[in-house]
Design a protein with these regions (language model features):
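Alpha-helical interface subdomain recognition
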Residues: 1-78, 232-376
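Internal helix-loop-helix
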Residues: 48-108, 155-158
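Structural signature of FAD isoalloxazine-binding scaffolds in flavoprotein oxidoreductases
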Residues: 64-73, 111, 129-133, 181, ...
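A short, Trp-centered hydrophobic/proline-enriched beta-strand micro-motif
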Residues: 113-124, 164
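A generic structural signal for well-ordered coil/turn residues at beta-strand boundaries
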Residues: 113-115, 131-133, 158-160, 175, ...
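Flexible, small-/acidic-enriched active-site or ligand-binding loops
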Residues: 132-133, 152-153, 182-219
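A structural signal for short hydrophobic beta-strand segments in well-ordered beta-sheet cores
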Residues: 135-138
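A short core secondary-structure module
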Residues: 149-188
């Protein structure tokens, strides 16, 4: 199987890189605005240029293409490294609005940059029977009332609407349902939570939050019919961001090893350093292959739950090894905040727990293996 990038994907990568370079989002300078936790000008340019809307139908405001194209964008943003609402706002929310009935209007607004969204309380719903309902929706006079809480919602205090997965308990209507809750809703409270990646995350509480029927996305109680595939896509794109960050750290460490002189020779001439760099290179390449393999499976319309879990679990471990090796090569210089190495390290660390820990992802793979062996 040929996993090398296509000409279109190379053009997408070059396009994203050009926008990042124009805004100073490079290895030596990564601007981050404290409000809303990313550079709004850069994000606006990425949206208006259409690079972050690849993989979505042109009829709905996207740029067309496949999931593999979104993976290229994620990899380029991770390589920046750039904090943005890409995987949460565009990928996860966009794919949910695309998959759920009646999400077209909101999807158009998202892809046009007219409205911002984030996901809330989604984790675990792709594993039926394993999730306790943190947010519950019950019928009310105006439509629906939401109560409960969710942790670590990315940009939860800054978006126009939160796409909240809630468990409906209303007569015959039961089960997970997606609600688009305005960020300004009465009874919705946010509490900022600092993260290692610097993303603006918040714990969100819902206390008698009222929304009408127009804020139900898709069919009531039927979210699990389409959510697993959306989670698969999210895991693959997040893994791609980790690969990009690891590749950035490796490139920086390689340059350092070739220019840092000790005892009248570049430290890259030492075999121990060469071995570290070689191992890190293998980790980056194999992680990248796992991502593109999983993306290809999704693009072909095949069942991708195991492949997506494998890709994210492997990338979580491999990319952390790469950033750790880069720090060892840089030595004490690598811990200074005026050096960019810690940014790639933080980016990987922040992405690892999203949409399932390594342990949980491996349990998905293990269950599949045991099921297959039992069937034989």
């Amino acid at each position: 199987m040929d996993l090398s990038p296509t000409q279109r994907q190379l053009e997408i990568r070059d396009g994203v890189t050009t926008v990042l370079a124009a805004h100073g989002a490079s290895e030596s300078d990564v601007p981050v605005s404290p409000e809303p936790g990313y550079d709004p000008g850069l994000w606006s340019e990425l949206v208006s240029s259409g690079w972050v809307t690849v993989g979505f139908p042109e009829a709905l405001g996207g740029r067309g293409g496949e999931l593999s194209d979104l993976v290229v964008v994620g990899e380029a943003l991770g390589n920046g490294p750039v904090m943005s609402p890409f995987h949460g706002g565009i990928v996860l929310c966009g794919q949910a609005l695309l998959a759920a009935a009646g999400g077209g209007e909101r999807l158009r607004a998202l892809l046009a940059g007219e409205r911002t969204f984030t996901y809330c309380n989604w984790e675990g719903f792709d594993q039926p029977g394993e999730t306790q309902p943190n947010v519950v929706a019950s019928e009310s006079r105006s439509g629906w009332q939401l109560d409960g809480s969710a942790r670590l919602v990315p940009y939860g205090a800054d978006v126009d609407e939160l796409l909240v997965m809630a468990h409906v308990r209303a007569g015959e209507q039961q089960g997970p349902t997606l609600f688009a809750v305005p960020g300004s809703s009465s009874g919705l409270m946010t509490n900022p939570v600092p993260t290692i990646g610097g993303d603006r995350c918040s714990d969100v509480a819902f206390s008698r939050v009222e929304v009408d029927a127009s804020h139900v996305v898709g069919e009531v109680g039927q979210a699990t019919e389409w959510l697993p595939r959306v989670i698969d896509v999210g895991r693959v794109v997040i893994a791609a961001e980790m690969v990009g960050a690891a590749a950035g750290a490796l490139s920086h460490a390689t340059h350092w090893a070739s220019t840092r002189v000790q005892f009248n020779a570049a430290i890259g001439s030492l075999q121990a350093v060469q071995h570290r760099l070689a191992d890190a290179f293998i980790d980056v390449v194999t992680a990248q292959d796992s991502v593109y393999d999983a993306a290809g499976i999704i693009d072909r319309g095949e069942e991708a739950r195991v492949a997506a879990a494998e890709a994210k679990a492997y990338c979580s471990d491999a990319c952390r090894r790469v950033t750790a090796a880069a720090h060892q090569i840089w030595g004490g210089e690598g811990i200074y905040s005026d050096q960019p190495l810690h940014l790639w390290h933080r980016r990987v660390a922040a992405l690892v727990p999203i949409l399932g820990s390594v342990r949980n992802l491996r349990s998905i793979v293990a269950a599949s293996v045991l099921s297959d062996s039992g069937a034989q």
